[in-house]
Amino acid sequence: MEILRAEHVSYSYQSKYQKVEAVKDVSCSFEQGKFYAIVGESGSGKSTFLSLLAGLDQPCEGTIYVQGEPLSGMDRDAYRLNQAAVVYQAFHLFPLLTAQENVMLPLEFKKIKKKEAASQAQRLLQRVGLESRIGRQFPKMMSGGEQQRVAIARAIAAGGEIILADEPTGNLDSGNEENVVALLNELAHEDGYTVIVITHNQRVADETDHVFRMKDGCMEQVR
């Protein structure tokens, strides 16, 4: 089933010296339960396109559809809270909160009672492969791989069907990178998420179902 679709999407902005066409007439679609990579050199438009899929920016031309509904007509904050989880290279965990408390945040935004939110957060931490003791630890006590797993658990805590990840393994060593990619694969193929990652890493791209390449704002599907 198609979850996300871009139709003739373009995005440009004015830099100090010139107009920059970051995304040029991109059309593509993403299905439920599939793992996708978007690759390309720095400045090719990958992260800009991901921000459009996340509703962080709006296309200058074209339309992004979420299960057939134009994203432009939706409450974009609600979309990111309830439908699309965004994960970044920097983990963005709150340093004064434990792992469990970090994961509880989106649940509390949804007015879920604290006891139930704590229970759900613990289950999510287990789902991403973390031992129960990690839930009581603060970010500075965790490895990079553990912090990224907490970030993924927090991102999917409120539900939804889409994971948008911008270089999620960029700060990790090869062992932790492999574990995080395996987790994203499981979330796609076992849990039914549509997982889209931006990556420079060919090893990461090789583990996905489909690969799109961007160059100078244009996109082509290469697998």
Question: Where are the regions a protein language model picked out?
Answer:
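ABC ATPase NBD coupling module
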Residues: 71-85
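Conserved ABC transporter NBD signature motif
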Residues: 62-71
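Helix-to-loop junction immediately C-terminal to a conserved catalytic motif
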Residues: 54
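Short coil-to-helix segment of the ABC ATPase nucleotide-binding domain corresponding to the Q-loop/switch region
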Residues: 97-105
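Conserved catalytic motifs of ABC-family nucleotide-binding domains
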Residues: 159
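Conserved ABC ATPase "signature" region
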Residues: 115-133
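Conserved ABC ATPase signature
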Residues: 138-142, 146
